[in-house]
Amino acid sequence: MEYFVEDILHHRGKHQRTHIEFLVKWLNYPPDKNTWEPYSSLRDVVKLHDYLRHNNMANLINKQHR
């Protein structure tokens, strides 16, 4: 089964890729199915990039595999 991100709602943790999680609203699922996901699971998701830019965290986008 494939899941699609509808929105990124919030984040928690330090502003470092290894210590940050994002609260994900999944497409076609109710809010009680929202989950906290690590950056590593979402790093290629466009919605995450939009969220990071909007929250002045865009520096995390291009730090992959450094």
Q: Across the structure, where does each feature detected by a protein language model lie?
A:
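Long, charged, low-complexity intrinsically disordered regions
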Residues: M1-R66
